């Protein structure tokens, strides 16, 4: 075993040397989505570091077929928009996210909240922020209103049959009945008091924890069923940095004819720092001030404020539920790249998110990175799903680089043979499409 590991270490060293000698043609990004909640009940992959696949091009090359017509699949700035937020047991954070989504100068037409915890407190919050009533309360009110109307009808009939009505009194009775009729219709009248520009809420509780992948898949399909022309992805622990984010994304999408556009994802506690390192050219950037220009084509941070055309989903589909958490964002990015659709990141707006850069460990003086999450639960999904991703079209040729980087990180930098063995086992599970979840 030691001899095999020594040979693998030597192979990693030589492969690393070849890679670093051709940095201009190979993208070394290794980022996948994450969660901050450890344990088997983790909500979704975007409740913490969601590290996007930060560059297109050589990382996941587009398929050789003719690129789709940009105009056909581009985001319609005048179309209906549904915001989709996936949450799990984080009511306080969700409240801040909902506040900023509802304050947008260009408000979404719907806000769909997928609740992986089916928590009544979340349902109450959604309707408190966006209007309407929780379904259980609304159903009870409707039943009570119907029963009250029935009692009124029966009472009126009994009164009419048992009393002698003097001449001319019928007109007065009818006059008295008029307010009663309008009172019975008051619930619908009250609903008209809600400002028409306020987003319409849709609360989707799930008694099965769908993870981030399944949560966004459900939310996307619900948005399509409503007739949304575009879907705006939001998160419960992140939020738009200001009230102009959605309007800015629409402007950029129209100008660039984009099927998908993302804001810059910044550190929620330090707006000048990126929440995740981003590679521009051959250099890894960690600060907003280090970025050049106002638009980065072919770069996307999905599920963190990204706006996606509904027509584009005819081609790229919805996130893969099997991945549950971590890697679903990278896999979705892979599909966008291979589709040939136009996409990119606007540097003129931001989505604030907790810092996720700590689990990306630099190697070779920062020229490359590997991912090492805290906790076995996070590592299980990160490395297993990464193995699956590396077996998919557009990413297979990066497999030697993947082995080299992680062998270097575990065997040379950390001197952690057990850690490398764990990585290798989980990576193999992913390549074999073994999607069982740990107990």
Regions found by a protein language model. Name each.
Residues 288-308:
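A recurrent flexible, glycine/aromatic-enriched loop bordering the glycosyltransferase active site
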